[in-house]
Amino acid sequence: MKFVDSASIFVHAGDGGKGCVSFRREKFVPKGGPDGGDGGRGGHVWLRTNRQLTTLLDFKYKKKYIAVRGVHGQGARKTGRDGADVVIDVPCGTIVRNGETNEIIADLTGEDQEILIARGGKGGRGNQHFATPTRQAPRYAEPGQKGELLMLNMELKLMADVGLVGFPNAGKSTLISVISAAKPKIADYPFTTLVPNLGIVRYEEYKSFVMADIPGIIEGAAEGKGLGLQFLRHIERTKILAILIAADSPDIADEYHTLLGELEKFEKELLDKPRLVVVTKMDIAAEDLEIPTLEEGVRVLSISAVSGQGLKELKDELWREVSGRIRAAEPLDESLG
C-alpha cells in the first residue's frame, strides 16, 4: 500500500431544508390558519479516528465530501427529515488545519475520537411561525440556512512509542522485522526503506509497544538531502528515540553527533526526548571494536538482529522507558491521597 501522510479535501455540510408555506384546508374549516412545517437540518460532516488506518491514501482519490441537505417542510405542520451525516474516517495522529488560514482545527490522537468539522444548516421555519393577530395568513417561510463548507489540509504524524533513527543501512528495518510483526523491505543497499513502517513489539503477555522505522537520515537532511527529513515528523509523538549506528561505522561518535545535529535542525524539541543508542550488526563487528561513551546519561546497547545478541536487553530497556512515561502521563487518583 502506498504511504501518504498529507492530503487536502473539501467538505460541505448539507443545507437546511426550506420552510413550507401552507394553510389548513379541511371540509368544515374553509379558512384554516397557516400550517407550514419546518425544513429539516442539513447533514453534518464528522471526522472519526480509525485505528485500522495508517495512511491518508484514500484522500488522494476522493477529495469532496458533501452531506445531504435537509428535506423541505410540508403542510399539516410536518417537519422535514434531517439530512444524513457524513462520517470521514482518518488515522490516529491526524492533524487537521483550515485550508485558508492554516489554523489547527483538531489534533486527532485518540482511538475512535470524533469531531464535528462542518455543521449542517438549520432548517427554515414554516409559515405557521409567522402568524400574528394582525397577520393571520402569512404567505412566506424561511429558506434553510447554508451548511458550512471549508477546505481541510490534513497531515499525519504516526502514533508510535519508539522511533528508530539512523543513517541508511544502520539495520533499522532488520531490527523492526525481528522484534515485531512488521515486514519491511530489507536489502543490502542504502534507502531500502522509502516510507515509515510501524511494528507492534510484544514484550510480555498483555504488554506491547509500537515502534516506528523511518527512512535513513543522511548528513544535510535538514537542507533537503535524502529521504528521512520529510518523514521526521512521524517520530515527534514518540516517547523515546533509539539511535541506531552500525558496528562497522568508520566513526561511531561522529555519526551519533551528526544524527543529533540533523534532528536539532528539523525540530529542536526532538533532543528533549529520552534516547538510547543501539550499536547494531555486532555479528560483523571487528574483534577489537571499542564502543565509546557518547554522552553522559545516554545508555549504549550492542545488538545483532541476526544472532539475537542483546535483543532481550533492548526490549527490556525500551519497555522500561515506554511504560514509565505512560505512567507519568496518567492523571493521579486524588482519592488515594
From Swiss-Prot:
Residues 1-159 form the Obg domain. Its EC number is 3.6.5.-. Pfam families: GTP1_OBG (PF01018), MMR_HSR1 (PF01926). One of its GO terms (cellular component) is cytoplasm. Residues 160-323 form the OBG-type G domain. It comes from the Bacteria. GTP binds at residues 166-173, 191-195, 213-216, 280-283, 304-306. The keyword Protease does not apply. Its main location: cytoplasm. Mg(2+) binds at residues 173, 193. Monomer. This is GTPase Obg. It comes from Pelodictyon phaeoclathratiforme (strain DSM 5477 / BU-1).
